[in-house]
Structures are given as structure tokens and as C-alpha cells.
Amino acid sequence: MGLLCSKNRRYNDADTEENTQTAEIERRIELETKAEKHIQKLLLLGAGESGKSTIFKQIKLLFQTGFDEAELKSYQPVIHANVYQTIKLLHDGAKELAQNDVDFSKYVISDENKEIGEKLSEIGGRLDYPCLTKELALEIENLWKDAAIQETYARGNELQVPDCTHYFMENLHRLSDANYVPTKDDVLYARVRTTGVVEIQFSPVGENKKSGEVYRLFDVGGQRNERRKWIHLFEGVSAVIFCAAISEYDQTLFEDENKNRMMETKELFEWVLKQPCFEKTSFMLFLNKFDIFEKKILKVPLNVCEWFKDYQPVSTGKQEIEHAYEFVKKKFEESYFQNTAPDRVDRVFKIYRTTALDQKVVKKTFKLVDETLRRRNLFEAGLL
């Protein structure tokens, strides 16, 4: 009898412990479910090369702990690859222009750099790139300074030359140091095509989550073949942050050199606006790469782009930059209202001028986005 009671007591104790564990699991699930309800989902969209991923990296630096040493080191081969790929693009572009351009002579690489150019082009075409040594960096620097390469770089918009080119070429000695660890700026400039979906959770007010919203930001591949992966992310989105690189009005797509990048951005923007699942979703439009735009607009007329063919310059210098920017902004505003159903026009729509590489601008912009979304939430709750 005593043995039976002892067994029953053990079973009861085990049941009690199991019930306690079950209750704890259920409590945690309930807490996590409640926490999830308070997390706002942001979708970062845009065509390839729009600067989305740079914005994403800035968020990690600004509102999280940034990149630890292991993460920084992981970018070293990426940055070295960027250098090799870029110098190959410029070398091969110069050769093509020397063969086909009317003013071909200025694209002919000097005799002392021809052999170096062929060697670097071969390296740039490999699947595995060597570590950037001082010797290779010096050869790249010599080729970069060649007059033909500089003339080719001036026509980089025709050759898919990336925005990071000048920055990395001017830092070759540091990048080739045996103990090189990328800086946060190096990481921001590093060019990696986003494939699939990456996410980050953050609060623009810092660690004190009680005083601000918590966001989960999703960055997705911008190239055409990546866009089918967006679909499952569309439900339950608080806001779409759409990045448009306004400096790329004279460039063509990486994946389709017959398609103007700005026209592709326009079509993608309009397609996103029409999606039924975004009926009540706020839209934040980032007119990005303003730093490049303000330099380019003084050299390349805005009306080279079909969408902007009715643009008329009115001045020079800073006035012209502002005039051109306001014209582009107005075009996007018109597109928004033309492609938004009448019953959706009251959803939040804001436009921000951004430079993804400028941390102060990105920080200020996201605080404005946070303020806008918090006001919307208060309004919907009847508290405003």
C-alpha cells in the first residue's frame, strides 16, 4: 500500500511538473504573440541598384549594435571582389570604346598598362578572386589612373560601372593591407546583390522600446528574377518603403541593357501601388542617391529619360538642382495618385529626399517615418 502511494505521489509530482512546464510554454507563446502584434512590418522595395541594401545596413548601424569584427571581416572578400570586377568593367569597356567609338583614340590604353589591363581583366573574370595584395593594388592603381580608363569611367553610366568605384579606387592602399579589416563606410559602399529576403528588427528611439514603435524591416532582391519572392511578404505590412534611385535616369538595367532604370522604377512603383494587399498600407517614397543626382544633373540633362522628356531647365547651379529634383518629385506624386484607387487616396503617402550613404540623413528620415506611423496609429485608435 505504501509503495502504491509512493508511486502515485511520484506520478502526481511528474504531472504537476509537466503541467507547470506546459503552462510556462503557453505563457511564453501568449507573450510572444502579444509582442508580435506590436511589431510593425516594413517592406523595403525598389529596383536593383536603388540603394535599398545600403539603407538596410544603415539601420543595423544606427538602431542596432552595428557590425561586430567577424561581420566586418566577412566583407573583406566582397570588397576585394568589387575592386576586381570594377577594374575589369573599365578595362573591357575601354577596349570596346576604342574599337567602336568615333573618338576612339582617347580610349586606347597606354602601352605600359596594356599587359596589366589584360591580367586584371582575367582576374576579374574568375569565380574565385585572390586576396588583394600591395602588388596587385599598385597595378590596379596604375591602370585606374590611365587616361583611357578615366575617359571610360566618365561614361560609366553606359557600362554598369557601380557607384562604389571611385571610393574603392581611392582607398586601394588601405584595402590591400595585410591586416585590413573593413570599416563601416567600406561595408556601406560594398556592393552585394540581395537575393532572397533578409530582415532586421529595430526601434528608431533606441533601446527604450516603451517610448517608440518596434519595426521589422524586410529587404528583398530588386532584380526582376527576385521579385516573385516578395509575394508572401505582402500581407500585414504597416508600410512600404520604396527606394527610387533618382540619379539613374540615364542608365540601363543590370539585367536588361535595353531598359532605362528610371522607367523600370516607374513601372515597378506603379505595379506595387496597385496591389490589393496594400489597400491600407502607408507608402514612404525615398528619392535616393541625391548626392549623385546633384552632380549629374549639371552635366546630363534630365530629359534624356523618356519619363522626363517634358523637362525644361531654368537655371544653373544649385537652383537647377532644386528645380530638377522638384520636377522628379512631382512626377512620382502624379504617378502615385494616377495609380491609386479613389478609395485608397487617404492612405499615408510621404516623400523623402535621401542619400543612403549619409548616416545623418538616414537617421533623420527614419525618425520622420517613425513619427508618421505613430501618428497614423494614434489616429486609427481614435486618440488623435
From Swiss-Prot:
Region (G1 motif): 41-54
Region named G2 motif: 186-194
GO biological process: adenylate cyclase-modulating G protein-coupled receptor signaling pathway
Annotated segments matching region G4 motif: 284-291
Pfam families: G-alpha
Keyword annotations: GTP-binding, Hydrolase, Lipoprotein, Magnesium, Metal-binding, Myristate, Nucleotide-binding, Palmitate, Transducer
Protein residues bound to GTP: 49-54, 163, 188-189, 194, 222, 288-289, 291, 356
Region (G3 motif): 215-224
Domain notes: The helical domain (69-189) is required for self-activation.
Biological function: Guanine nucleotide-binding proteins (G proteins) are involved as modulators or transducers in various transmembrane signaling systems.
Protein's name according to its UniProt entry: Guanine nucleotide-binding protein alpha-1 subunit
